[in-house]
Each structure stands twice: as structure tokens, then as C-alpha cells.
């Protein structure tokens, strides 16, 4: 094992997570229909500021992310600062790392606090699958630019006459990888076939996720980290995630047909995450500053690591590459963990990663390590359910996982928790959290 990499300031202070909060997560075109991501971000940051009773002027920086970019608000972070009553002098910038976006925001803030350039900061992310940047065809886009430069009516007519009806049709956001043309679902199908992940195993994991998430809500474990969202037209507030199957029945999962490979496939709408709207944020500061302000940290950032692999095969295997790096940097092994929370983009992807965690062959051939990462104890794994149940607003999921894990570690008397996720582009992230 390599020498641990301590995430502390020059004075030896750890990076504390003082608060974490999120909106309820809503399926596309339901409770948050018509609400853009920037407004969801404003909601969660405003509520966090109100709950912590922290003077906004003390916040040095806000780092926020959004995966589905809106052209009218390209720097979502700055718009949140300007729209929540925070000091206009608060620095703000946006990040994007696909499904690992809010992990990246937290990592950036952590490094800034370590460097001493920032004392207190907010990190998070928001996404809306209900308010999408519907574009135009490349031919129409070029014509519009040319029209703007045309000098007379004849030139405009010549430009317009080249257009066909099909060129006028709206173009929805791409769902496939730019570099490969493959969708996430197609990659999940490939991983299911390559690693012999059965349909029954995928459905069982989805059923487990929904059952545990429903129980977590019933037990009141999530109420402190999710606030009731009041959004226009203010007809009915959303108090909790609306994707969770409250009475999940395993037998019902088998009734759904595969989506991405209709003949031989196993990935269905029930064992994949739905398109989701939501926002989440965490408040970070050096631990000494938390003491000065009389704030009790939820926990600390022990380590993090990012990874990148090929996009043509096993693109969603990022957790299996990032996790050993994060564990090494934390100076621990998988068996030292109290909790493990892996982003469930698809049941197939999750199960394939769990299989690789336990594989010595994978460790030797892909990681250059003698031993496997380790077999995951399912009693520690996604104990409150995962993204299959909660949903997945791309940029918000990381902050949800961090907050959820820290609260659960506190309920268990402390310990170490691992958060890990795959992301588009063959990216992966792993973060080790610590609670005393």
C-alpha cells in the first residue's frame, strides 16, 4: 500500500462537512416540471443558509455543477450566488464531470481549503431533465448565423431557400456518448452480457434498492437531509422523492420488457435509474473554523480519487478503478469500511462493479495489483437504498450520497464510509468519508 495522502490544511486541520441538504428528487415531468436546474440550485442553497443560520458573508466560494447545460445560464454557480441573497463578492464557478459532478465540486473546495485560499464554501449540483436545451439542426443554425450577416432581402431569400422542412425540426439533447455514439443503457447491456449479470439479479438489486429506500423514509432517516420544496405554481409541495416504489414487489419487475436490446437484453426501466430533477449541496470548512462558529461537523473528507478508462468496453466500471486509489490515499482497505455507497446508474453496472471488486484476475490484469479490492459485505452496501430508487439528477447525486452516508455513519456511532460512482466518458470517482 502506498503512503496515505492526508487531506489537511498546512496547520493540520481536516476538511469538515458541516451540513448537507437536498431537494426531494422528482421523476422527469412531474413535481418539478418546468423548473430549471438553476432554480432548484437556488432552492437548496437558500434553505441550507437558513438552516445553518450562517452569515452568508462568511462564505468565500460556491462551486456548483450542472450536466444538462442551459445556454441562458452557463455559470449556474454564479447565478445561485446572485439569486439567494449571498454576498455579491462571493466567488463562484461551475464544474461538470457528468454523474460525478458534485463529487468534483467537493474535491475542488477541499483542495482550496487545504491550500488556504478558501475558509468556508458550498459545493453541490443540480439538474433538470424536465427543462431541456432543445436545439436546432446544424443546417438551420448555420442559416441563422448567415441570415444575421445578410445585407439585403435577396441574400436572405437565397439562404432560406436552401432549408428543408426536416431542417426546421427541433433537436433534443443527445443521449449517446459523443465519442462512440453509444448510450449509457447500451453500455449497461454490454456489461451485463460480458460479465454474466442475469436479469433476475438485476431485478433483485432494484427491488432491494426500492425496499430499503422506502424503509429509510418510513423510519424518518432522510427527513433531516431533505427539505419540502415549494415550487410554482405552488399547488402541492413535494416532501419526498417520488420515484420510490413504496410497496416494491419483485415479481412485478419481471413483467417489463428490455429497453436497449429488445430481443436478448436484460436492462429495463425498472432496473435502471429514471430521468430525474433535483439539487443537492454540502457546506464545507476547515475543522477549526467550524469550532470557532460553534458548528458540529457531520464528518470529514478523508480521501478522494478520480479515474478514466476506455469508453468502448465496460465504460461504467469507474468505481472499480477509482476505489483502490481512494482507499490507498486514505491508508485503509475495503474491510476497514463501515459503509459502502455505490451509485446505481443501472443494476447491471452496479453488479458488474461488485463482481470486479472481488476479482483477483481483474485486479492483476486491469489494476496491476496482486490482490482483489475485496468482496463487498452487502450488510454495508447501499443500506438506505440507492439511485435506482431515489433517482439520479446527474449533478446532484454525489452530494446526496455524501450527506446520506455521513448521517448514517453518525447513527452507527462513527466510522469510515466509501462513496463511489461511474460517469459518462469512462470516468469514475471514489471518496472516503470519516465520522468520529
UniProtKB/Swiss-Prot annotation:
Enzyme Commission number(s): 2.3.1.16
UniProt pathway: Lipid metabolism; fatty acid beta-oxidation
Location of this chain's protein in the cell: Cytoplasm
GO molecular function, one term: acetyl-CoA C-acyltransferase activity
Active site: 99 (acyl-thioester intermediate), 392 (proton acceptor), 422 (proton acceptor)
DNA-binding keyword on record: no
An individual GO BP term: fatty acid beta-oxidation
GO cellular component, one term: cytosol
Class of the enzyme per the UniProt entry, highest EC level: transferase
Annotated catalysed reactions: an acyl-CoA + acetyl-CoA = a 3-oxoacyl-CoA + CoA
Keywords tagged on the record: Acyltransferase, Cytoplasm, Fatty acid metabolism, Lipid degradation, Lipid metabolism, Transferase
InterPro entries: Ac-CoA_C-AcTrfase_FadI, Thiolase, Thiolase-like, Thiolase_acyl_enz_int_AS, Thiolase_C, Thiolase_CS, Thiolase_N
Superkingdom as given in the UniProt entry: Bacteria
PANTHER family referenced in this protein's UniProt entry, alphabetically: ACETYL-COA ACETYLTRANSFERASE, CYTOSOLIC (PTHR18919:SF107), ACETYL-COA C-ACYLTRANSFERASE (PTHR18919)
Protein function: Catalyzes the final step of fatty acid oxidation in which acetyl-CoA is released and the CoA ester of a fatty acid two carbons shorter is formed.
Family per similarity comment: Belongs to the thiolase-like superfamily. Thiolase family.
Subunit details: Heterotetramer of two alpha chains (FadJ) and two beta chains (FadI).
Protein name, per record: 3-ketoacyl-CoA thiolase
This protein's encoding gene: fadI
Amino acid at each position: 500500500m502506498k503512503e496515505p495522502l492526508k487531506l489537511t490544511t498546512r496547520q493540520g486541520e481536516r476538511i469538515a462537512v458541516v451540513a448537507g441538504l437536498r431537494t426531494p428528487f422528482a421523476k422527469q415531468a412531474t413535481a418539478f416540471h418546468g423548473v430549471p436546474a438553476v432554480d432548484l440550485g437556488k432552492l437548496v442553497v437558500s434553505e441550507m443558509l437558513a438552516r445553518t443560520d450562517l452569515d452568508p458573508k462568511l462564505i468565500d466560494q460556491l462551486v456548483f455543477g450542472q450536466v444538462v447545460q442551459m445556454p441562458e445560464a452557463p455559470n449556474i454557480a454564479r447565478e445561485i450566488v446572485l439569486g439567494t441573497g449571498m454576498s455579491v463578492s462571493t466567488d463562484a464557478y461551475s464544474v461538470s464531470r457528468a454523474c460525478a459532478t458534485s463529487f468534483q465540486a467537493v474535491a475542488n473546495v477541499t483542495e482550496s481549503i487545504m491550500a488556504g485560499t478558501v475558509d468556508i464554501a458550498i459545493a453541490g449540483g443540480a439538474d433538470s431533465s424536465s427543462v431541456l436545451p432543445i436545439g436546432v439542426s446544424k443546417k438551420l443554425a448555420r442559416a441563422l448565423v448567415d441570415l444575421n450577416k445578410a445585407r439585403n432581402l435577396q441574400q436572405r431569400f437565397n439562404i432560406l431557400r436552401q432549408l428543408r422542412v426536416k431542417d426546421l425540426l427541433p433537436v433534443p439533447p443527445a443521449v449517446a456518448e459523443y465519442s462512440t455514439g453509444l448510450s449509457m443503457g447500451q453500455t449497461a447491456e454490454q456489461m451485463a452480457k460480458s460479465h454474466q449479470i442475469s436479469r433476475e439479479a438485476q431485478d433483485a438489486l432494484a427491488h432491494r434498492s426500492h425496499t430499503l429506500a422506502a424503509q429509510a423514509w418510513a423510519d424518518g432517516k432522510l427527513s433531516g437531509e431533505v427539505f419540502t420544496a415549494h415550487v410554482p405554481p405552488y399547488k402541492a409541495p413535494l416532501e419526498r422523492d417520488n420515484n420510490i416504489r413504496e410497496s416494491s414487489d419483485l415479481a412485478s419487475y419481471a413483467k417489463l420488457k428490455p429497453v436497449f436490446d429488445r430481443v436478448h437484453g436484460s436492462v429495463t426501466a425498472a432496473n435502471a435509474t429514471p430521468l430525474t430533477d433535483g439539487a443537492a449541496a454540502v457546506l464545507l470548512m476547515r475543522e477549526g473554523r467550524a469550532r470557532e462558529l460553534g458548528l458540529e461537523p457531520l464528518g470529514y473528507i478523508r480521501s478522494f480519487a478520480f479515474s478514466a478508462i476506455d469508453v468502448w468496453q465496460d465504460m461504467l466500471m469507474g468505481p472499480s478503478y477509482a476505489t483502490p486509489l481512494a482507499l490507498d490515499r486514505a491508508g485503509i482497505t475495503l474491510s476497514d469500511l463501515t459503509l459502502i455507497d455505490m451509485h446505481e446508474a443501472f443494476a447491471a453496472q452496479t453488479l458488474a462493479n461488485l463482481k470486479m471488486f472481488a476479482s483477483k484476475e481483474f485486479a492483476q490484469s486491469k489494476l496491476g495489483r496482486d490482490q482483489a479490492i475485496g468482496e463487498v459485505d452487502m450488510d454495508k452496501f447501499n443500506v438506505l437504498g440507492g439511485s435506482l430508487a431515489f433517482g439520479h439528477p446527474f449533478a446532484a447525486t454525489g452530494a446526496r450520497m455524501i450527506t446520506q452516508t455521513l448521517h448514517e455513519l453518525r447513527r452507527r456511532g462513527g466510522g469510515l464510509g466509501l462513496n463511489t460512482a461511474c460517469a459518462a466518458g469512462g470516468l469514475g470517482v471514489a471518496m472516503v468519508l470519516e465520522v468520529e
